[in-house]
Amino acid sequence: MAKTVNQHRKDIVEIGKRIYQLGYVAAFDGNISVRLENGNILCTPTAMSKGFMTEDDLVIVDSQGKAIEGKRKVSSEIDMHLLIYQLRRDVNGIVHAHPPCSTGYAAAGVPLQKAILAEVVLVLGCVPLTRYGTTGTSELTDAIREYVPNHDALLLA
């Protein structure tokens, strides 16, 4: 049985709290979304700590990124999520975080292409490093476009 929108809301809030507590996001970093059964996207808002969100803070957008439900402003990175959902019909949820170790690799220009941990290879495979794209612009979606069809995780430069 598919989850309800309310169940997805609870899940996103819980994931937000966990990634905040683990130090994978700070301040207003990161964003989370889920593709709903009707094709709309439930996502975190912009300018809000993922550790302190409530279910009412989440926003529903259509497939073009237009807000159709919710009081808050949509994440500036919604176009990145929409591109991933468009290119990957098998993807129904996205978590964009800033774990310190991953951020360090990205800042140093080092992709995670070597089999450092067996668990990472088994679950994610190669994690390529994209070129830099400014948040909320087509630079970002252009930077990830070539990698999305064949990778489940990306390091954003």
What do the PLM-derived regions correspond to, one by one?
Residues M1-A157:
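Glycine-rich flexible loops
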